[in-house]
Design a protein with these regions (language model features):
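N-terminal cationic and glycine-rich segments that engage phosphates or anionic surfaces
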Residues: 1-116, 121-125, 130-139, 210, ...
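Positively charged, low-complexity, intrinsically disordered RNA-binding extensions
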Residues: 139-240
Length: 240
C-alpha cells in the first residue's frame, strides 16, 4: 500500500508538471502564430517573430511545433483565428497591471481576467489609464554582466545599434532600446560574442510602487494566478 501510495503521488506530481509544460508550449506557439500573421514568416524581417522563436527554443518547444505555429500564422484560411488583447488594471494597494493575452475567445479571456482581479480586490481600468505609467522597450539581457577594460567600447557599440539605456547588476546587464530596434541590437550582442540570456519586448514601469508586506503578498498571488491562465502571455506590474 505504501509503495502504491508513493507511486500515485509521483504520478500526480509528474502529471501536474506535464500539464504545466503543455500549457506553456501552447502559449509559446500562439505567440509565434500571431507574430507570423502580423509581419510574415521570416525572422530576419520580423523582429517579433524572432523573439517568439527564441523564447520557444529556450523553453525546448520542438522544432516541428515552431514550424507548424509559423505556418498557422501565414496560412490563414481554415485556421482558428487568434487575437491579441491587452487589459489594464489596478490591483490592491494601487499597483498598476498590464495583462497581455493571445486568445481564440475574447469573452472567455475577459471573464477570466476580470474574475481574478475583482476577487483579489482590484479592478479593470480603461484603455490608456495604466500604460502611461510604463515605457515599452525592447530588452536584451546579457549574462554575465558587461565589465572589464572594454566595457566603454562595448556600450558605445550598443548605443550605435540603438541602445537607449544600459543597466548593470551582479548577474548581468539589461540593454534597452526602442521596440523597432530590438533585432538590430540582438544582432550586435551576438556579433560581439556575448551571451543573450533573453530577448524580449517589455513594459517597464516609470516609477515603482511600495506596498505593505500583506498587500505585496496579495498582489504576488494575483500575478501568479493571472500568469497561470491559458490565454495570458505576459503580466507586468509596477510593484517595487
Amino acid at each position: 500500500m505504501a509503495r502504491h501510495s508513493k507511486w500515485h503521488k509521483v504520478r500526480q506530481f509528474k502529471g501536474a508538471i506535464d500539464a504545466k509544460r503543455s500549457a506553456s508550449f501552447t502559449k509559446l506557439a500562439r505567440e509565434i502564430t500571431v507574430a507570423a500573421k502580423e509581419k510574415g514568416s521570416d525572422p530576419a524581417m520580423n523582429a517579433r517573430l524572432r523573439v517568439a522563436i527564441e523564447r520557444a527554443r529556450k523553453a525546448s518547444l520542438p522544432k516541428d511545433n515552431i514550424e507548424r505555429a509559423i505556418q498557422k500564422g501565414v496560412g490563414g484560411a481554415g485556421e482558428v483565428q487568434l487575437e491579441e488583447l491587452r487589459y489594464e488594471a489596478y490591483a490592491p494597494g494601487g499597483t498598476a497591471l498590464i495583462i497581455e493575452c493571445v486568445t481564440d475567445n475574447r469573452n472567455r479571456s475577459t471573464n477570466d481576467v476580470k474574475h481574478l482581479i475583482t476577487d483579489a480586490g482590484g479592478s479593470l481600468a480603461s484603455a490608456g489609464s495604466v500604460t502611461y505609467l510604463f515605457d515599452r522597450f525592447g530588452v536584451v539581457r546579457v549574462q554575465p554582466a558587461i565589465d572589464g577594460e572594454k566595457r566603454d567600447e562595448i556600450e558605445l557599440s550598443f548605443i550605435e545599434a540603438g541602445a537607449q539605456d544600459i543597466l548593470h547588476d551582479d548577474e548581468g546587464s539589461d540593454i534597452r532600446c526602442a521596440p523597432s530596434e530590438l533585432a538590430v541590437l540582438a544582432d550586435a550582442v551576438q556579433q560581439m560574442g556575448l551571451h543573450a540570456e533573453h530577448i524580449e519586448f517589455e513594459w517597464i514601469p516609470k516609477i515603482t510602487v511600495e506596498t505593505t508586506e500583506d498587500v505585496g503578498m496579495q498582489v504576488q498571488e494575483l500575478l501568479e494566478e493571472l500568469e497561470a491562465l491559458d490565454d495570458v502571455s505576459r503580466v507586468y506590474s509596477n510593484m517595487a
